[in-house]
């Protein structure tokens, strides 16, 4: 469903503007769709990229950002932080956002799994480390699950990902993400299963994540 919505966006517009598909949905889709996610987030890491979005949209639609029409569930709303709306597709309502990440070094690439430009894995680590600082202790622990899945499938976050997260959130960004992960892993088994079920995560996948190293940041050296 998400892929069919993404196909309606103009990839050339997004590439020219330097806009990338990111967030938890982008991560989950690459990691075998390990959890359910019905949000579509595009990140705009420069003033110019967000300006391109603001110039293209109005309260009725997304203009030239789309190459095929979408059915909107609510009007398009814009402020200095983002452009937000929701679309109806396949009987579902999907939240859609273009978020201003001005002055963030987030690498945007083409990826064979996606019909639009996406954040690379390093940029995904950066944004998830900071997201875990903002809301990591909040059930159903989406950011914790994503960090654990990324560690299990992608390995340690690159040094540049940690450096960029620290540039915006300070040197406590990794310790605070570690605390969120440790908090989740210390929950009673029933609470962890409940959180996983709320996100459509299979029990065997949860068991694999529980075996992942607790640290959100790079593993300690020898």
Model-derived features with residue positions:
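Compositionally biased terminal segments of proteins
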Residues: 1-222
């Amino acid at each position: 469903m998400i892929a069919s919505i993404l196909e309606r966006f103009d990839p050339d517009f997004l590439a020219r503007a330097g806009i990338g598909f990111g967030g938890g949905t982008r991560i989950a889709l690459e990691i075998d769709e390990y959890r359910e996610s019905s949000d579509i987030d595009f990140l705009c890491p420069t003033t110019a990229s967000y300006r391109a979005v603001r110039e293209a949209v109005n309260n009725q639609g997304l203009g030239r950002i789309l190459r095929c029409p979408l059915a909107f569930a609510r009007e398009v709303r814009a402020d200095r932080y983002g452009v937000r709306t929701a679309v109806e597709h396949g009987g579902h309502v999907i939240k859609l956002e273009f978020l201003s990440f001005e002055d963030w070094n987030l690498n945007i690439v083409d990826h064979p799994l996606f019909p639009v430009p996406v954040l690379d894995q390093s940029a995904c680590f950066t944004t998830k480390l900071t997201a875990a600082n903002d809301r990591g202790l909040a059930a159903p622990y989406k950011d914790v699950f994503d960090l654990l899945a990324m560690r299990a499938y992608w390995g340690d976050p690159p040094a540049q990902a940690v450096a960029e997260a620290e540039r915006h959130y300070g040197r406590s960004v990794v310790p605070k993400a570690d605390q969120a992960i440790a908090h989740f892993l210390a929950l009673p088994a029933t609470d962890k299963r409940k959180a996983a079920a709320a996100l459509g995560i299979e029990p065997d996948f949860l068991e694999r994540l529980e075996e992942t190293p607790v640290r959100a940041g790079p593993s300690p050296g020898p």
